[in-house]
Amino acid sequence: MMARRDPTSWAKRLVRAQTLQKQRRAPVGPRAPPPDEEDPRLKCKNCGAFGHTARSTRCPMKCWKAALVPATLGKKEGKENLKPWKPRVEANPGPLNKDKGEKEERPRQQDPQRKALLHMFSGKPPEKPLPNGKGSTEPSDYLRVASGPMPVHTTSKRPRVDPVLADGSATEMSDRGSVLASLSPLRKASLSSSSSLGPKERQTGAAADIPQPAVRHQGREPLLVVKPTHSSPEGGCREVPQAASKTHGLLQAARPQAQDKRPAVTSQPCPPAATHSLGLGSNLSFGPGAKRPAQAPIQACLNFPKKPRLGPFQIPESAIQGGELGAPENLQPPPAATELGPSTSPQMGRRTPAQVPSVERQPPHSRPCLPTAQACTMSHHSAASHDGAQPLRVLFRRLENGRWSSSLLAAPSFHSPEKPGAFLAQSPHVSEKSEAPCVRVPPSVLYEDLQVSSSSEDSDSDLE
């Protein structure tokens, strides 16, 4: 019977038994806790409690019978402040609080003793305390100390001004101080002498006491000479306005550059002042030199001439503004000169061709005129015959440096404008010296030369 048993079958049975035992065993990983135990790492999604999951039978959402009402815990009386806003009153203050109170009372008792000692040595009555309780330090307090150098006491408070004088005198003193700061020492002395007058006398006599400089400037637009008030005649008009006698006039006199851009205009009822103020170098009259109308300076200041139209052989406007040319050759005189007739003045009749005022608004020193330069006169009589008015003659002078200078020559009234010979014979202003070396230059060469000079000046002005 024993021989019939196969050892291989016995081995197979052992392997089967071992595999069945392995399958019955739990997995090798972490074991899950039994349902009765709680795991704080788990959280239920239904009730939000820790210790179980949503599938557990301990969840109160699934088993309502097992849900318990949370019981309130007992009160802890020692940690809660039932009356937080009630101040604590200490019936018996400690020894530390007593020491603090004594230290605060000691300086209060020493203050009246110090004031009494200071009153005895200085002899001054005791000071009354201010309503805000802050004491004020006076400069005399520093003088009471006998030893040591006297310190410098500076206060940042402004001096009080009397309310009666605060309205008028304070503003006048501030204005007077600002004016004195911008004037020279000589003007300060004259202004201090005029300040002793009354307010009304100061307004009328400021122009007479303070030496006002003449308003004759050497800028691009020379102004008429304005005389002080005391030099004008009694019957004539007053050229200086009333505002010039006040402090505003002094500030304008201190800034002469701001007045160059505003030409002064004389009124009509002042003919002697207007004739006296016009000098040889003025640029205000646009009419002929020997035939200046009576209202020429007023028209020159108020109504400036319009931009003339350019002909085929005339000078462009850019060359006129460059400073080397005078005016176009076909400029017509104002209509007042032809209608009112000639009115010759003694100063204007004595002028030479070099002194005749030009139309360009430039000072006379900016254009050098050499006596050795050759001169040439040109005029277009065809345009004058069509217009029916008197043309203006332009005298061109070629300088040594290759530039040109021009000046206006007034032509007298002639009956036959078609004849150029009669025009040259009747003009009294052309001197023999200028006609003798006269060389006729074609207009094209003259126009090209003027364009070159104007372009060179424009480039120089751009570089500056």
UniProtKB/Swiss-Prot annotation:
It comes from Homo sapiens (Human). Primate-specific FAM90A gene family, thought to have arisen during multiple duplication and rearrangement events. Belongs to the FAM90 family. Residues 1-42, 70-389, 411-437 are annotated as: Disordered. InterPro entries: FAM90 (IPR039213), Znf-CCHC_6 (IPR041670). This is Protein FAM90A3. It comes from the Eukaryota. PANTHER family: FAMILY WITH SEQUENCE SIMILARITY 90 MEMBER A11, PSEUDOGENE-RELATED, PROTEIN FAM90A1. Residues 74-89, 97-114 have a biased composition (Basic and acidic residues). Residues 180-197 have a biased composition (Low complexity).
